[in-house]
A protein has these predicted regions:
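Acidic, polar low-complexity linker/tail segments
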Residues: 1-54, 149-151, 155-156, 160
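VWA/integrin I-like adhesion module and closely mimicked acidic/polar interface patches used
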Residues: 8, 128-134, 138, 145, ...
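Von Willebrand factor
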Residues: 29-160, 163-167, 212-226
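Short, hydrophobic/amphipathic alpha-helical packing segments
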Residues: 58-67, 137-144, 256, 260-263
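Alpha-helix termini
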Residues: 68-76, 147-158, 194-207
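Short beta-strand-loop
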Residues: 77-125, 222-236
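Von Willebrand factor A/integrin I-like adhesion domains
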Residues: 122-123, 208-288
Length: 288
């Protein structure tokens, strides 16, 4: 039977993922820096013909981020990234993997002498496809739950405060959906869940250990629409920026380089240190 013909049931796949997670800590005792990147893959990101430049640039930025981080000898072992793509539905988050692990998988898959069949079941790379509408709240909740589960896996293993980055081009379509329990809207529930992890002192500065959450949006070029998008995203508590930030069209690659440098700065610091973010001027749209 060829490798392509092998099909595993869900229990075996979960066992493979669990084994992979256990080996991660046995093979690499470094402190971990958990990062979740959330990619809006709704139709507006793809364009009506499915070939919008901003989605092409986002996918190139995704590859650039991995290539940049693997070059940093510290970040490649400490940064752990999970990716979430979303639209009407939210994809299963990819496994938390270090840039070094991703590089090892790519090298193994390029070696015809190695049996890498099991890698396709590990879910380490996002799938980019048109996912229609924009369930941003559900995507954020998925990110929070994914990090919480990862922190449980860490146990006493040293780690940095988690980081979440959201890239979108529009307003959420699930604000008024019912939240679990039915007593709140999904928007209200998401805000409260973020507040559990993003906390500020009396001067409005992020507290020590507070999570990083940065929502960025790609402007449409229509001032009113862009103002509405910014307002809708700025409802969420965020840090280090107090509101959503506009990502200048055409500078998406620069944004991913900025994320890479931010993650490298975090990974090369002590776990209790405040994060020093690089200057965002290369990607931030001015006067927004």
């Amino acid at each position: 039977m060829s490798h392509e013909q092998i099909s595993l049931n869900s229990d075996v796949i979960e066992s493979l993922k669990e084994q992979f997670a256990e080996e991660q800590f046995a093979d690499n005792p470094e402190p971990r820096c958990p990062v979740v990147l959330i990619y809006d893959c709704s139709t507006s990101m793809w364009g009506m013909d499915g070939d919008d430049p901003k989605m092409r640039e986002l996918m190139r930025g995704h590859e650039l981020l991995q290539d940049e981080l693997v070059k940093d000898l510290v970040a490649r072992e400490r940064a752990e990234i999970s990716y979430i793509t979303y639209g009407t539905q939210v994809s299963e988050p990819t496994l938390f993997t270090t840039p070094g692990e991703i590089n090892d998988i790519k090298e193994a898959e390029a070696d015809p002498t190695k049996d890498t069949t099991h890698y396709k079941y590990l879910n380490t790379q996002p799938v980019f496809t048109d996912m229609v509408t924009t369930s941003t709240n559900q995507a954020l909740l998925t990110a929070i739950e994914t990090i919480e589960k990862r922190l449980e896996k860490y146990g006493s293993h040293p780690h940095y405060a988690p980081m979440i980055f959201l890239v979108t081009d529009g307003m959420a379509t699930d604000h008024n959906a019912p939240a679990p329990g039915g007593n709140q809207t999904l928007l209200e529930y998401t805000i409260n869940r973020l507040k559990e992890h993003i906390k500020f002192d009396e001067k409005g500065r992020p507290e020590k250990g507070s999570w990083v959450f940065l929502p960025v949006y790609i402007p449409t070029g229509n001032p009113k629409t862009d103002a509405d998008i910014k307002k809708s995203l700025s409802i969420y508590p965020s840090a280090p920026a107090p509101e959503a930030q506009p990502l200048e069209p055409g500078n998406i690659l620069s944004f991913f380089q900025w994320i890479s440098q931010s993650v490298q700065n975090r990974s090369n610091s002590r776990t209790e240190e405040a994060l020093a973010f690089p200057n965002p001027s290369n990607w931030l749209m001015p006067s927004m």
